Swiss-Prot record:
The active site is at 123, 256, 286. Keywords: Acyltransferase, Cytoplasm, Fatty acid biosynthesis, Fatty acid metabolism, Lipid biosynthesis, Lipid metabolism, Multifunctional enzyme, Transferase. One of its GO terms (molecular function) is 3-oxoacyl-[acyl-carrier-protein] synthase activity. Catalyzes the condensation reaction of fatty acid synthesis by the addition to an acyl acceptor of two carbons from malonyl-ACP. Catalyzes the first condensation reaction which initiates fatty acid synthesis and may therefore play a role in governing the total rate of fatty acid production. Possesses both acetoacetyl-ACP synthase and acetyl transacylase activities. Its substrate specificity determines the biosynthesis of branched-chain and/or straight-chain of fatty acids. It catalyses: malonyl-[ACP] + acetyl-CoA + H(+) = 3-oxobutanoyl-[ACP] + CO2 + CoA. It comes from Burkholderia orbicola (strain AU 1054). Homodimer. One of its GO terms (cellular component) is cytoplasm. It is found in: Cytoplasm. This is Beta-ketoacyl-[acyl-carrier-protein] synthase III. Its EC number is 2.3.1.180.
């Protein structure tokens, strides 16, 4: 008897934003006390961001991941003990090691000895994690994966640099991906170019347990913008080709929620109407690896994304890294 082809498909989604919502005006007032000038109008015009969420000092990335994971598990209707693969995409882990994924596995009470590890591709992290989990499931090594993007970027922001501190926020999003004979993930593409590592980085490093250098995020905004708009269209087309789909067959585009100008540029280049693009950056800012699953969960829960529809996710981030995946929800 011929063995059936194995696919992976999305069973459920979840997300979590910490309760401390900081509006542009609140952030502007905070910065003004430090002698730094900005305004709600300046931030919105350049980024489309109106607010972001910051985690409390005693809340870690794994805590945010836990809340999002619980919601995804509930939505998927799976037994947590059936999850035999956990991948957390993050650039702000709780510790140097162990991985945030291992900490999350323990917090969820999963005792089955399944694999758990982190992926670090900054804002492309969720695209990398989803493609990785899909490959593991298709190979037959694992059956049910929990994929999480979670960040506490507020911990690495320099609040004396108005060009970066207004952009980022904290949050987490999660997806349950499970083995299926029915096609789900249809195509993925991942890329990196380390020669651009200096345009978006946190240059501090761990040396014998002590952080040397700056622990704050540094970004060349113009260079990032130029590179992002160039690679995002290409990687989207590549993923679509692997899925045997044309851009017009995509029901929903979920780009990394970084900057509304980058997002709309990519949407326009793909020939998609703006109404098919999911936008949540206005409400939570750039949450790095968490942004794509946050937006995905929002659109699933408000009824925009329906079963059977084609979804294209794409991200670009420090490294420089970029990636995209196409799936049938």
């Amino acid at each position: 008897m011929a063995q059936s082809t194995l696919y992976s498909r999305v069973l459920g989604t979840g997300s979590y934003l910490p309760p401390d919502r900081v509006t542009n005006q609140q952030l502007t007032d905070r910065l003004a006390k430090e002698g730094i000038e900005t305004s709600d109008e300046w931030i919105v015009a350049r980024t489309g961001i109106h607010a972001r969420h910051f985690a409390a000092p005693d809340v870690t990335t794994s805590d945010l991941a836990l809340e999002a994971s619980r919601r995804a598990i509930e939505a998927a209707g799976v037994d947590p003990q059936s999850i035999d693969l956990i991948i957390v995409a993050t650039s702000t882990p709780d510790f140097v090691f162990p991985s945030t994924a291992c900490l999350l596995q323990n917090k969820l009470g999963i005792k089955n000895g399944g694999a758990a590890f982190d992926v670090q591709a900054v804002c492309s992290g969720f695209a990398y994690a989803m493609a990785t989990a899909d490959s593991f499931i298709r190979s037959g090594q694992h059956r049910t994966a929990l994929i999480v993007g979670a960040e506490t970027f507020s911990r690495i922001l320099d609040f004396k640099d108005r060009t970066t501190c207004v952009l980022f926020g904290d949050g987490a999003g999660a997806v349950i991906l499970s083995a299926s004979e029915e096609p789900g993930v249809l195509g993925s593409a991942l890329h990196a170019d380390g020669s651009y590592s200096n345009i978006l980085c946190t240059p501090g490093n761990v040396n014998r347990g002590v952080i040397d250098g700056s622990v704050f995020l540094h970004m060349d905004g113009q260079a990032v913008f130029k590179l992002a708009v160039n690679v995002l269209e290409k990687v989207a087309i590549e993923a679509l080709a692997k899925a045997n789909l044309a851009p017009e067959q995509i029901d929903w585009l979920i780009p990394h929620q970084a900057n509304i100008r980058i997002m709309t540029s990519t949407c326009r280049k793909l020939g998609l109407p703006q109404e098919r693009m999911v936008v949540t950056v206005d409400q939570h800012g750039n949450t790095s690896a968490a942004s794509i699953p946050l937006a995905l969960d929002a659109a699933v829960r408000d009824g925009r994304i329906q079963r059977g529809q084609h979804v294209l996710i794409e991200g670009v981030g420090g490294g420089f890294t970029w990636g995209a995946s196409v799936f049938r929800f």
